Amino acid sequence: MRVVVAGGGTAGHIEPALAVAEALRDKHGATVSALGTARGLETTLVPDRGFELHLIEPVPVPRKPNMDLLKLPFRVAKALGQARKALKDTDAQAVIGFGGYVSAPAYMAAKSLGLPFFVHEANARAGMANKLGVKLGGVGLNAVAGSGMDGDVVGIPIRAVLSGARDESAADRARDTWGLDKDRQTIFVTGGSQGSVSINKAVEQAVDQLVEAGFQVLHAVGKKNELPAAKPGYHPVPFIDDMQAAYTVADLIVCRSGAMTVAEVTAAGVPAIYVPLPHGNGEQALNAQAVIKAGAARQIDDADFTAQTLIDATLDILLHPSTHQSMSDAAKTSTAGNASTVIADMIAATINSQHN
């Protein structure tokens, strides 16, 4: 069984692709390859997980008419040719895409070669590439209802190791890695791989009060941002590749509300304060609504996110054990965590039905 997954650029596109790839490999014995671009995180994440990566040109679609729009047909043609070659070289039997710059060429290549293909939309509002994929005949799979893309609701695929009970031995190893105190509650702050100016600024101004209140802060500031000086109770790092380790030590997470992030944090059972990115299609403001209504998280809009709002929300959660426990319980009882297997089974069934 041979499958190609397409999802590149940001972790939000790559991680669900790799989660399904691992489920296909581990449960169905599939050989899985990935399509990506040379610019994205996939250049390290995909090989690190043991999968072959085939590079194609990214095809960003300009949101406004400009000169880049004139170049679009040529970029699409080049990327389509590269994607077709990758599918032929791997002798792919099915393709699944997760949005982003590499997905549209992957869908078109699969369509042109007569291969079954699947389209997974993680966000509450579907992107253009995925809408195109379904219109071309792909099987639509939505994380939540009402995305604007036809298809069944299956949830967001996450790695099996991210869900389930907390591994205390893994937590101890993670604390040793970052120099964390086992007797202090840990606030894990991240703005994603590139970091967030607004989140970083608020944390910088709030950290002394948070530490004085008895907490410690593990802060992923972003690869391109200057690393602040560490001090007792404050542990800044550029970026965290092993999110599983970070989740095991976190008592509270402060982060953006990308669809993949929300799914992982919820499956890990960690209470969260989400600060939606106020750009794009506005999907981040929608992604966490279900878990917020369930009581597993809180949301502070980016424009309202300051040192004081961060401190107030954090103290309200961590200084009240019953509040913290109820949020954690709400996360743990959610349905997050099983979409990888569901999707892998669908792909395997489709391939098997065509060869029986």
Curated annotation (Swiss-Prot):
GO biological process: carbohydrate metabolic process; cell division; cell wall organization; lipid glycosylation; peptidoglycan biosynthetic process; regulation of cell shape
Principal EC category: transferase
InterPro entries in UniProt: GlcNAc_MurG, Glyco_trans_28_C, GlycoTrans_28_N
Gene3D superfamilies on file: Glycogen Phosphorylase B
Binding site for UDP-N-acetyl-alpha-D-glucosamine: 10-12, 123, 159, 193, 240, 284
GO terms assigned for molecular function: UDP-N-acetyl-D-glucosamine:N-acetylmuramoyl-L-alanyl-D-glutamyl-meso-2,6-diaminopimelyl-D-alanyl-D-alanine-diphosphoundecaprenol 4-beta-N-acetylglucosaminlytransferase activity; undecaprenyldiphospho-muramoylpentapeptide beta-N-acetylglucosaminyltransferase activity
Pfam families: Glyco_tran_28_C (PF04101), Glyco_transf_28 (PF03033)
Protein name: UDP-N-acetylglucosamine--N-acetylmuramyl-(pentapeptide) pyrophosphoryl-undecaprenol N-acetylglucosamine transferase
Species whose genome carries this gene: Corynebacterium glutamicum (strain ATCC 13032 / DSM 20300 / JCM 1318 / BCRC 11384 / CCUG 27702 / LMG 3730 / NBRC 12168 / NCIMB 10025 / NRRL B-2784 / 534)
Organism lineage: Bacteria, Bacillati, Actinomycetota, Actinomycetes, Mycobacteriales
Gene: murG
